[in-house]
Amino acid sequence: ADAADKPDDPNFFRMVEGFFDRGASIVEDKLVEDLRTKETPEQKKGRVAGILRIIKPCNHVLSLSFPIKRDNGEWEVIEGYRAQHSQHRTPCKGGIRYSMDVSVDEVKALASLMTYKCAVVDVPFGGAKAGVRINTKNYSDNELEKITRRFTIELAKKGFIGPGIDVPAPDMSTGEREMSWIADTYANTIAHTDINAHACVTGKPISQGGIHGRISATGRGVFHGIENFMNEASYMSMVGLTPGVQDKTFVIQGFGNVGLHSMRYLHRFGAKCVGIGEIDGAIYNADGIDPKALEEYKLQNGTIVGFPGAKPYEGSILEADCDILIPAAGEKQLTRNNARRIKAKIIAEGANGPTTPDADKIFLENNVMVIPDMYLNAGGVTVSYFEWLKNLNHVSYGRLTFKYERDSNYHLLMSVQESLERKFGKQGGPIPVVPTADFQARVAGASEKDIVHSGLAYTMERSARQIMRTASKHNLGLDIRTAAYVNAIEKVFKVYNEAGLTFT
């Protein structure tokens, strides 16, 4: 084994491949059985094994080095990567992270997770991921802009970005600002004649072709995912909790975009956040932490440490007392070293790859339910898909239907009112039909935000049902991750099988 593959620190790409293999071993016979071809059983087996071999590896990995000039006049060489795992559906899709932990292995692993994630939630993209190896705290805004714009040009030169080729998105230490720089650079250089140029990246500000609800999408999806599984009484009896998120306690590791918005939505629907951990310290309050107050404190102070609404927490926040643990930071946080000390009954993977295979086995033995990353944090790519469609359609959701829907709703109310008055109005004059508060809010038709929110909620619910059906069909119990991989493999397999090979 290579140096990085210590028992408790598995190679990240191989870790994802291991999870894939577990899913493939369960579904392989069924795939052979379902093939409607005239081949012999042996040929069918060979075809299935061959396609599974095609799915697994990362198709393209681009490694880049490029110079920038620092504010002090010094020259520096920056390293970056973009991995495209699969082109069974195009474009490829996946975030860009700025972190000192970026490596070829990490980018390949995250790209492969993106392929399976898109398949699980029925978003028609292949998986990709990019990383730039920098610590953003050591660079000025001006320097970060130079790095981002130059990285975009380097990707474009190699054909690794474009609305129909490969569409990046925000990830760790990147957000709307960086996406705006990417879109602007691409649209003003290599794609200055392409009307769809701004669809080259998602997670943009609204003024640059972004979509309402994208910033909170991953956290909102995490909430919907937790809710879908926690409302299922059969699962909750396995882990020993009552159904529903109401009054449950939760702890979050990582108070970035995903952590903050997961906390906000869970709090809004009656769950209680008792602990938050970040790289520089953790806080705990058994009576609950207010998300708004903590968000404001972090904005002002750049840290959660010292927040007056909670006490400092010594030791690992992952091991704190709670019902739901949400790792929303880096990968490989839950390992065989700490898995037995985790008190939560539900682990909701907001981050990508936070659980090692060894920890996964321990959780299954201990009846802890892990809601896997490839389903749970797919809210981000789902709403990115909506944004990409909006860019290709060149019109915001609801723009053409607003007035028509509103008028139709009022006509409906008047029609009911007039019918009632014709029948009963003789005795007492007019019978006003007044919309309820909830209906009044919807009378005007769906805004873009409403459409995004309902589309996301529907996606998370439908995918959860598919995963639950698969888990029950294959008697997987609490092994939700394997059920999700089985679903993803079936869908990707179908595309490869029916497309055939390009040149054989």
Curated annotation (Swiss-Prot):
Assembly and binders: Homohexamer.
Keywords: ATP-binding, GTP-binding, Mitochondrion, NAD, Nucleotide-binding, Oxidoreductase
Note: ADP can occupy the NADH binding site and activate the enzyme.
Family (UniProt): Belongs to the Glu/Leu/Phe/Val dehydrogenases family.
Superkingdom of the organism of origin: Eukaryota
Localization per Swiss-Prot or TrEMBL: Mitochondrion matrix
GO molecular function terms noted in the UniProt entry: ATP binding; glutamate dehydrogenase (NAD+) activity; glutamate dehydrogenase (NADP+) activity; glutamate dehydrogenase [NAD(P)+] activity; GTP binding
EC number(s) stated in the UniProt entry for this protein: 1.4.1.3
Activity modulation comment: Subject to allosteric regulation. Activated by ADP. Inhibited by GTP and ATP.
Temperature dependence comment: Optimum temperature is 30 degrees Celsius.
Gene3D superfamilies (alphabetical): 1.10.287.140, Leucine Dehydrogenase, chain A, domain 1, NAD(P)-binding Rossmann-like Domain
Catalysis: reaction(s): L-glutamate + NAD(+) + H2O = 2-oxoglutarate + NH4(+) + NADH + H(+); L-glutamate + NADP(+) + H2O = 2-oxoglutarate + NH4(+) + NADPH + H(+)
Protein name: Glutamate dehydrogenase, mitochondrial
Activity versus pH, per record: Optimum pH is 8.0.
Enzyme active site: K129
Binding positions (GTP): H212, S216, Y265, R268
Functional description taken from the UniProt entry: Mitochondrial glutamate dehydrogenase that converts L-glutamate into alpha-ketoglutarate. Plays a key role in glutamine anaplerosis by producing alpha-ketoglutarate, an important intermediate in the tricarboxylic acid cycle.
